[in-house]
């Protein structure tokens, strides 16, 4: 300690006798970043942090969009465990993937989305690249639009849309516009408003569509409504940009959930599509996704693929290996694929059951409100229709956490806490 003290004294003396040392120290203390302001907290992560600090044993976190089992625990699909075991037994290397990703994964993803017998796949007039989950697919797609979609910089999002859509497209250099989608009066789809707004969008603009399980509302168009939307899109010559983060997870049927995408293609509309395996395979942390562009012909697809690779190279060079191997193993193994589809249906069915039980318990509580929208909506999320002040009461009085707009993740509801949730909602809405 004495030696350390002496060295500090000597350092101070040196600085006093040598002004240059003091100036250097002062220069090191300055910063390039004094003008950088503290950014706003992420609204969903903020909910989670508040939940963690709460000591109430009955607390519920309904903000996070991750599936939980009926005990409220994270769920790793048995089919994923089997795929991991098969991969481990092969003692494979950990070499870089190509820029476009794992070939068998890309092929299987396109088949899952479009259907194995789709004309697009048979003719080869498509390109699919592996991406860093759905967010990466969106960013790659947005960057491709910014560079090559020469007709317009406007991307029209449904109101509301997933919160990350806006910064993804904005940071890629696109401009954001909106069209009516959710009707707060009915807690349902504003079909007439959406159709009217879409029909007024300038020709050759980009229209973003949620393929299924709209996030955050859980409100989806019916097939006959999708048909009318597709008709307007074709008439107005709009570019349909599909985000499909929940295939199979919405209804429990992957083909049903992909119906809108396939219908648009059948109508001669060349779309692009973002996929994620975070929800339907539970591969949240593996970051597994895909981006597909449907083209005029195979030659055009090759040109598009070449440019996608040029875009990806400076973004992240190449995508992660492990998650793509897991997904490809499941999708290309008949037994594992069958098991996985059953597990996806099981997850979807549990969420549907929780919706039904919540409404049933609200009726038992004596609520006079119409809660039918809870069972009408689909997928992981539910727009409850709760007002911000009611959400605040739920948090303060009952330790029930959700985003301020009243969105809840139904996956966070279990048979053990659904009664408590119904009681809490009734107390703040009666």
Swiss-Prot record:
Its main location: mitochondrion. The modification N6-(pyridoxal phosphate)lysine is found at residue 279. Disulfide bonds: none annotated. SUPFAM superfamilies: PLP-dependent transferases. Residues 1-29 form a transit peptide. The modification Asymmetric dimethylarginine is found at residue 313. Changing residue 337 to G: Heterozygous mice are viable and healthy. Results in early lethality at homozygosity. Keywords: Acetylation, Aminotransferase, Cell membrane, Lipid transport, Membrane, Methylation, Mitochondrion, Nitration, Phosphoprotein, Pyridoxal phosphate, Transferase, Transit peptide, Transport. Its cofactor is pyridoxal 5'-phosphate. One of its GO terms (molecular function) is kynurenine-oxoglutarate transaminase activity. The modification 3'-nitrotyrosine is found at residue 96. The modification Phosphoserine is found at residue 143. Acetylation of Lys-296, Lys-345 and Lys-363 is observed in liver mitochondria from fasted mice but not from fed mice. InterPro entries: Aminotransferase_I/II_large, Asp_trans, NHTrfase_class1_PyrdxlP-BS, PyrdxlP-dep_Trfase, PyrdxlP-dep_Trfase_major, PyrdxlP-dep_Trfase_small. Substrate binds at residues 65, 162, 215, 407. One of its GO terms (biological process) is malate-aspartate shuttle. Catalyzes the irreversible transamination of the L-tryptophan metabolite L-kynurenine to form kynurenic acid (KA). As a member of the malate-aspartate shuttle, it has a key role in the intracellular NAD(H) redox balance. Is important for metabolite exchange between mitochondria and cytosol, and for amino acid metabolism. Facilitates cellular uptake of long-chain free fatty acids. Homodimer. Belongs to the class-I pyridoxal-phosphate-dependent aminotransferase family. This is Aspartate aminotransferase, mitochondrial. The lineage of its organism: Eukaryota, Metazoa, Chordata, Craniata, Vertebrata.
């Amino acid at each position: 300690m004495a030696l350390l003290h002496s060295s500090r004294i000597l350092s101070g003396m040196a600085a006093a006798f040598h002004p240059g040392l003091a100036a250097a120290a002062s220069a090191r203390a300055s910063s390039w970043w004094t003008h950088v302001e503290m950014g706003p907290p992420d609204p969903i992560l903020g909910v989670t942090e508040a939940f963690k600090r709460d000591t109430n044993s009955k607390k519920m976190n309904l903000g996070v969009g991750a599936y939980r089992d009926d005990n409220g625990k994270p769920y790793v699909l048995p089919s994923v465990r089997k795929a991991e075991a098969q991969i481990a037994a092969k003692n494979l290397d950990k070499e870089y993937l190509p820029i476009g990703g794992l070939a068998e994964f890309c092929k299987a993803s396109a088949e899952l989305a479009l259907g194995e017998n789709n004309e697009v796949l048979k003719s080869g007039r498509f390109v699919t690249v592996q991406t860093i989950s759905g967010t990466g697919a969106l960013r790659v797609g947005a960057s491709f639009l910014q560079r090559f979609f020469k007709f317009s910089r406007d991307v029209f999002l449904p109101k509301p849309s997933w919160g990350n859509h806006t910064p993804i497209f904005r940071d890629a250099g696109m401009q954001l516009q909106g069209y009516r989608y959710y009707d707060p009066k009915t807690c349902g789809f504003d079909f007439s408003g959406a159709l009217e707004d879409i029909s007024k969008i300038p020709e050759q603009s980009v229209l973003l569509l949620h393929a299924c399980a709209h996030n955050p509302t859980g409100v989806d168009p019916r097939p006959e409504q999708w048909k009318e939307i597709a008709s307007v899109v074709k008439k107005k010559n709009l570019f349909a940009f599909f985000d499909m983060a929940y295939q199979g997870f919405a209804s429990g049927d992957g083909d049903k959930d992909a119906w809108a995408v396939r219908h648009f293609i059948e109508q001669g509309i060349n779309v692009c599509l973002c996929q994620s395996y975070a929800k339907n395979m539970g591969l949240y942390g593996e970051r597994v996704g895909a981006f597909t562009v449907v083209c005029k012909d195979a030659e055009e697809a090759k040109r598009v693929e070449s440019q996608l690779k040029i875009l990806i190279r400076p973004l992240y060079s190449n995508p992660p290996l492990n998650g793509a191997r897991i997904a490809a193993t499941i999708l290309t193994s008949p037994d594992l694929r069958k098991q996985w589809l059953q597990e996806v249906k099981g997850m979807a069915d549990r969420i549907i059951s929780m919706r039904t039980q919540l409404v049933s318990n609200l009726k038992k509580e004596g609520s006079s409100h119409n809660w039918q929208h809870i069972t009408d909506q689909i997928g992981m999320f539910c727009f409850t229709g709760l007002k911000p002040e009611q959400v605040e009461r739920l948090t303060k009085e009952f330790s029930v956490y959700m985003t301020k707009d009243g969105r809840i993740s139904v996956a966070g509801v279990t048979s053990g806490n659904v009664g408590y949730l119904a009681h809490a909602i009734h107390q703040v809405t009666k």
